[in-house]
Every structure is written in C-alpha cells, then in structure tokens.
Design a protein with these regions (language model features):
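Conserved, short, structured surface segments that act as functional micro-motifs
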Residues: 65, 115-121, 128, 139-174
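Active-site acidic-Proline motif in GNAT/NAT acetyltransferases
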Residues: 90, 135, 139
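Zn2+-dependent peptidoglycan hydrolase active-site motif and core
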Residues: 98-136, 161
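Intrinsic structural disorder/low-complexity segments
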Residues: 21-24, 124, 134, 167
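Bacterial Sec-dependent signal peptides at the C-terminal "C-region" and cleavage site
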Residues: 1-21
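Surface-exposed, glycine-biased beta-strand/turn segments
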Residues: 21-115, 145
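Residue-level recognition of beta-strand microenvironments
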Residues: 68, 107-108, 135, 152-155
Length: 174
C-alpha cells in the first residue's frame, strides 16, 4: 500500500505523528477510491445484465410487420377483434430468437397459438412466440438474448406461416 511505499522512503518514528497521520489519511483515500471503482464496476455489470434481460432484441433476422397490436378485422368469420400481439412475416422454418435473457415458462401447445414459447424476463416482463413449427427449448430452460428457440410455422389458428410476438409486463399485454 501507500503506507509501505512511504515508509521505505521516510522511516516513521514516534517523533513524527503528523507524517503518520498524513499517510493513514492517504491510505484511507486510496481505499475509498478503490471501493468507488468497485461499486461502479458492479453497477455497470448490473446495468448490462438488466438490459440483456429485457425483451428488446429482434425475434427474427428480418422484421416485416403483417399485423399490428390493437383492433383489427378478424381473419376468420368477420367482425372485429383485439389483436394482443404483433405479427411478423416469416417464411416456413425461419429461425426464431429469444429477445432477451430469461427462463422458459411455457414450451408447448396452446389451442389458438399452436406451438408456443413463453419466456420470463426480469422486471415482470414476459415474451411470447406463437404459431411455431418447431420448439428448441423446454420448460425451465434458461435462454440468452439472440439464442435460437424455435422455427416459425403455421400451427394453431392462422392464415399462413408467421410469427405472433407478444410482450407482457406484470401479466398485461403491451
């Protein structure tokens, strides 16, 4: 430490209490700075971990919107319905990616959505991927941002192959 460095240059004796006090204060300042640097590194790491855990990534290599979130004409039977996600054009078997780090809480069949994957992310967020042809992950699996999780398809109630994508926050579709 700094104390040892200075003690090699200027021997400390009981006759030099002021010098000893200065050295102790400098050691304390260095320790404080080290602690601040450590805390900043930890906060920065936490920020990056949090950002990767939010569903902010792209679920497909190319995003072409085919149906937006909100009210739309029903594809079957006429009338209007609230569309609770976003549909993206996808060719049969296009790779579908996790949009953030998380844990798979559903990987399986849903009557309307067909083959579906739901991932729980930090902060109460969940992402849902529906109408898949193939599922690469199982319930309980951990996934990372950009990891392939399945293949696009036309399972469930659909007019053709596409990816239905949803983001939920605290169980509310957004």
């Amino acid at each position: 430490g700094v104390y040892i460095f200075f003690s090699l240059l200027v021997p400390c004796t009981t006759n030099e209490p002021q010098l000893q006090q200065i050295i102790l204060e400098k050691d304390s300042d260095v320790d404080s700075l080290k602690n601040i640097i450590y805390c900043l590194k930890e906060e920065n790491y936490f920020l990056y971990q949090t950002m990767d855990s939010l569903p902010l990534g792209s679920p497909l290599d190319t995003l072409v919107l085919s149906s937006k979130f909100g009210w739309r004409k029903k594809p079957f039977g006429g009338g209007w319905q609230k569309h609770t996600g976003t549909d993206f054009l996808a060719a049969w078997h296009d790779t579908v990616y996790a949009t953030g780090n998380g844990k798979v809480i559903k990987s399986g069949w849903n009557v309307g959505y067909g083959r579906q994957i739901k991932i729980s992310h930090c902060g109460g967020y969940e992402s849902t991927y529906a109408h898949l042809y193939r599922l690469f992950v199982r319930n309980g699996d951990s996934v990372i941002l950009g990891q392939p999780i399945g293949r696009a398809g036309n399972s469930g109630v659909v007019t053709g192959p596409h990816l239905h994508y949803e983001i939920l926050r605290n169980d509310k579709k957004t």
